[in-house]
Amino acid sequence: METKKGSLDWKNLQYDLQPWIKEAIASLGFPTMTPVQAATIPLLSGNKDVVVEAVTGSGKTLAFAIPVLQKVSNRLYDSQEEGEAPEKVKQGHMLAIVLSPTRELASQIQSVFNNVIEYLPEDKIPIKTQLLVGSLSTVRDDLDRFLKDKPHILIATPGRMLDFMSSQYVKMNSVEIAILDEADKLLDFSFEKDVVNILKRLPKQRRTGLFSATISAAGNTIFRAGMNNPVKVAVKSKSTTANSAPSALHISYLMIEPEKKITTLIKLLHDYRYKKCIVYFPTCTSVKHFYSIFQKIVNGNDNTESFKFYSLHGQLATKPRLRTLQSFTDGDVALNKHILMTTDVAARGIDIPDVDLVIQLDPPTDPDVFLHRCGRTGRANKVGRAIVMLNDGSRELDYVDFMEVKGVAMQEMPTPDLNQSDHQQFQDKLRKYMLDDRARHEIAIKSYVGFVRYYTKHMATSIFRYQTLDYLGIAKMYGLLRLPKMPESKYIPNDNMPDDGWLGEPIDMDKYSYADNQQEASRLENLNAEKIKKIADAKRRKELKVKNEAWSSKTETKETKQERREKMKRKREAIEKQIMEESSDDEETKVDWKDIVKSNKKKKANSGSMQGSFDDL
């Protein structure tokens, strides 16, 4: 939709908003609309379903928050006759729902709604919101609060919303508008079933809005959202017709050896001027691993400037996650450089002020997430810088062309001048850090294995080929002392494979201890039990050997007897042959020697019989 510069003034909005909403917008400091707001608010506030695709940081949240509040206000305040009390919403009913793929984004959306609602006049019925996300509270607690507070707007993640709706006390008949934020994610295989089931239970006459920076990735699944003749609103960057990123966002890539990624990251964090930075890691374990390393090594260096690190990942419970995000948002930029170390849990929709720099240690497995990550900076026309590290010596350079086809242009940045002695010094500190606690090395191994699994799940398999991955470089980056046994190790060339997998000086693993006394005591107990078992196994093997030797001797005795039998047989055959040779040459009178023996015995018997007869006389 084309919009002239003058038309972005709120006075020129082609829809008459509630007076209190106009005052709230002015008080919040929004002098003009963004293009996506100018195009979307009139449509969604009226009777149109919308599919909105706009670059990150373009004001999408306010573009649907205002229409939602407008519809709720119309329902609460315009339905009353003069002098009559306003019509209240029935028990167990709500007027609007907003679905979000993550808890953090849902919490942030609620904050946007509440910021506007603060300016609601006191003589009006209070508009209430409720957050429904997993782990923050039980479904039962959510239901009790819902029935007690009677909120008008529910902001939820799909799973918790579906569980909440299963209660007989929850009625969906009054819902007038439904919003799907980050709709491409909500309509992919991980959420689609839950989202479709939720939308099926809503009134057919409701209004529906789908919002995302990459809505086209959802394809035909958007038609399963139950919309009626939706209007598509697409707002692109003016910098280039093919660029999906905002013009104020500069995206660069850096070709670097895997082993030097962390030292390069540290140098970037030192050298760049920024207030807040988000660093994306591939897995939850890697966030925990490197967060601990940076706290101990980087912040422990007296020569460094002051850094404030935060850890945020999907394995954290909901309350710590929201608390961490709030602490990072509220961080005083005058005192420290603030660095959030996170996964894709903070890739979508999160709007944090003063984020000037985004660094990706590795590209995401889903190319659509790449732009969402980068979009955490360069928001609301503010200049932002995003950097992605690509593994040198691989085909990952093709990722640049791959993303350009998808409308994301990147520029190569020169490799930072990294002092080899500084790199070696960090590696020495990292090794000492590992040797101080066996538990650290176990986390390092989990991080390394998790990264390998992560790498094999890349959608662009022709670019990210795990057969050619620099496994040794990655292992050194994670600080491993020794390579773990895993199938992928077969891709390491034999010439490069270290002896017995050791990446440095071998150590005695039996003496490699935990820093935690309880863990170490348990390890020693298991080690002692294992030694006892080994001794018992050795004794049992020795007994079996003796038993096997006795059986072997018995076998030899049997073999000796067999040899004697065969010797006797040969001797007997020789006697037979001799007798045959001594027999008469007359072939007709040849007599078998056995017959002769029998005959002689018979004669003796007969003679004995006759002697006996004569004796009787």
From Swiss-Prot:
GO term, biological process aspect, one: assembly of large subunit precursor of preribosome
Compartmental location: Nucleus, Nucleolus
Principal place of residence: nucleus
Assigned keywords, A-Z: ATP-binding, Coiled coil, Helicase, Hydrolase, Nucleotide-binding, Nucleus, Ribosome biogenesis, RNA-binding, rRNA processing
Domain of life: Eukaryota
UniProt entry tagged with the keyword Coiled coil: yes
Enzyme nomenclature, EC number: 3.6.4.13
Coiled-coil spans in chain: 515-585
Basic and acidic residues bias (residue ranges): 555-566
Any one GO molecular-function label of the UniProt entry: ATP hydrolysis activity
Catalytic function, reaction form: ATP + H2O = ADP + phosphate + H(+)
Annotated ranges, domain Helicase C-terminal: 261-421
UniProt domain Helicase ATP-binding: residue ranges: 41-233
Motif (DEAD box): 181-184
Enzyme class at the top of the EC tree: hydrolase
GO CC annotations on file: 90S preribosome; nucleolus; nucleoplasm; preribosome, large subunit precursor
Gene3D superfamilies found in the cross-reference section: P-loop containing nucleotide triphosphate hydrolases (3.40.50.300)
Family: Belongs to the DEAD box helicase family. DDX55/SPB4 subfamily.
Cited function: ATP-binding RNA helicase involved in the biogenesis of 60S ribosomal subunits. Binds 90S pre-ribosomal particles and dissociates from pre-60S ribosomal particles after processing of 27SB pre-rRNA. Required for the normal formation of 18S rRNA through the processing of pre-rRNAs at sites A0, A1 and A2, and the normal formation of 25S and 5.8S rRNAs through the processing of pre-rRNAs at sites C1 and C2.
Subunit-structure text: Component of pre-60S ribosomal complexes.
Protein name stated in the entry: ATP-dependent rRNA helicase SPB4
Phylogenetic lineage: Eukaryota, Fungi, Dikarya, Ascomycota, Saccharomycotina
Encoding gene per record: SPB4
